[in-house]
Amino acid sequence: MMTTPIYVVDAFTNQAFKGNPAAVCVLPTSRDDIWMQHVASEMNLSETAFLHPYQDGYSLRWFTPNTEVDLCGHATLASAHILWELDHISAEQPITFYTKSGILTASKRGEWIELDFPSEQPKQENVYPNELIDGLGIQPLYVGRNRFDYLIEIDSEQRLKELNPNFSLLEQIDTRGIIVTSKSTSTEYDFISRCFFPAVGVNEDPVTGSAHCCLGPYWQEKLNKNEFLAYQASKRGGMLKIKLQHDRVFLLGQAVTVLRSELLL
């Protein structure tokens, strides 16, 4: 019987059952899209990462339970964590990932993993779907959009934490997801956020690395700084360090393996 190892990693946290869980499937060679989608649906996590050796690194693809996505931060962090944990790559060696969003790299920084991602600067939108505001039940300070998501700033951290979106309205919007953010009222964090992706089968993502490729540049202009400590205020919650340099966003997070298993196929 053919078996395939698969792991579940809690990303952007140093505690089990916090952060964002991702499944990581390490393959010897590529598998077909239908098989990968079936596995992702079976795992039923916000993302499942599939990787196999390619050139001087690894090919990496990400699937939600419903569809493939072009960029995913927490599953990339989880993939790097597993490759180092299993000694596929020495801890001193950066990992190169070949993805649909180009070449991404991961490096160890002590107990943290640093991801080198492209900046996804939002552009302000003056016209936007009614479902966006009705679905969130808020009055925005700002509405913008990049190639993936809408970005909305609101004026209250408490209001952000209390949001109870109407997902049947939000999933009608032609976008991957909706990022809602506010300046943090604490001295610990610069800003907080929540991220909703009903269109791809994930109502609320616990911690979204790729969203911070948009949040980082946005708050860089607002706060006139290049380094941030951010918190995603989902039920599980998660923390990220962010550094901006030119058109790159460096995301730093931690990860914990919580499950090792085998697919019997």
UniProtKB/Swiss-Prot annotation:
GO cellular component terms, A-Z: cytoplasm
Pfam families: PhzC-PhzF
Catalytic EC class: isomerase
Example GO molecular function: isomerase activity
InterPro entries, alphabetized: Phenazine_PhzF-like
UniProt family annotation: Belongs to the PhzF family.
PANTHER family: PHENAZINE BIOSYNTHESIS PROTEIN, PHENAZINE BIOSYNTHESIS-LIKE DOMAIN-CONTAINING PROTEIN
UniProt xrefs under NCBIfam families: PhzF_family (TIGR00654)
Protein name per UniProt: Uncharacterized isomerase BH0283
Organism of provenance: Halalkalibacterium halodurans (strain ATCC BAA-125 / DSM 18197 / FERM 7344 / JCM 9153 / C-125) (Bacillus halodurans)
Lineage of the species this protein comes from: Bacteria, Bacillati, Bacillota, Bacilli, Bacillales
